[in-house]
Regions:
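Outer-membrane beta-barrel channels and translocator barrels
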Residues: 30, 43-44
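Transmembrane beta-strands of outer-membrane beta-barrel proteins
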Residues: 46-52
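Feature marks flexible
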Residues: 1-24, 64-226
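A cross-kingdom feature that marks long, compositionally biased intrinsically disordered regions
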Residues: 25-29, 38
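Transmembrane beta-strands of outer-membrane beta-barrel pores
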Residues: 43, 54-58
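Membrane-spanning beta-strands of outer-membrane beta-barrel proteins
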Residues: 30-32, 223
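Residues on the lipid-exposed face of transmembrane beta-strands in outer-membrane beta-barrel proteins
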Residues: 35-41, 226-230
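Intrinsically disordered, low-complexity acidic/polar segments
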Residues: 48, 59-61
């Protein structure tokens, strides 16, 4: 069995196996603005020609690695509860003898990712709870997903609208230099930018939750040329 985002190995490293994943998604747009001017005049025995050309391209692109998002979700969802709360053990005893010592998961809000908060909220779970969510159990037929409560009992919850890339922040989608999304001229969700951001905006612009939006402007090279001919 393969986990979500995993793909079967190629035959002898040469041929793709049946079931190989092809999930990258990309789109782009390009337009061009151009102005050309030319004139000529006679000055005595000279015919002088003057010309000028201005051209600006505007290229934008957006891409997402769909299969890798499963890997990212798996890493982010329970990252903040991957340690045990050893300071608060629960002792189970029978007839005066200690039978079992239980350590529940420890919640660490400082290490909780925005995706983890958004997913728990969408599932109707406490954002500060220690429920262990199994993202690989997601059922496309009814949008159900399995999770284990603090006592290790399995339950099901439902994502009414399924997973959405807006659950992530831009930094989560580009962390450690990994290109889960790539974009310029669009925002990290794939929406066309309404204005050209500045270089500083990439480092300073934040949303209402204090997350950096990381806008990247479209590629807009300018070409200019002029000539004078006698």
């Amino acid at each position: 069995a393969l986990l979500n985002s995993s793909s079967p190995s190629a035959f002898y490293g040469m041929y793709a196996a049946p079931g190989s994943i092809q999930s990258n998604y990309n789109y782009s747009e390009a337009d061009q603005f151009s102005v050309k001017l030319a004139t000529a005049m006679t000055l005595g025995n000279h015919e002088v020609k003057i010309g000028f050309e201005y051209e600006q391209r505007n290229n934008r692109s957006y891409g997402v690695a769909g299969d890798d998002l499963w890997y990212l979700m798996r890493n982010l969802t329970n990252f903040h509860i991957d340690q045990l709360d050893t300071e608060n053990p629960e002792i189970v005893s029978h007839d005066g003898f200690v039978d079992t010592i239980i350590y529940k998961r420890k919640y660490n809000g400082d290490s909780q990712y925005q995706f983890a908060q958004n997913l728990r909220k969408a599932l109707g779970l406490s954002e500060t709870g220690i429920d262990w969510i199994n993202t690989d159990s997601y059922d496309f037929n009814d949008n159900s997903i399995e999770y284990y409560d603090e006592n290790g009992i399995m339950h099901k919850a439902y994502l009414q609208d399924g997973f959405d890339i807006s659950m992530f922040t831009p930094d989560e989608l580009t962390q450690d230099g990994n290109s889960y999304v790539s974009y310029y001229g669009y925002d990290y969700l794939g929406n066309k930018l309404k204005k050209q951001p500045s270089f500083e905006d990439f480092f300073t612009e934040q949303d209402e939750n204090g997350n950096y939006t990381r806008p990247v402007g479209s590629f807009r090279p300018i070409y200019m040329a002029g000539y004078i001919q006698d």
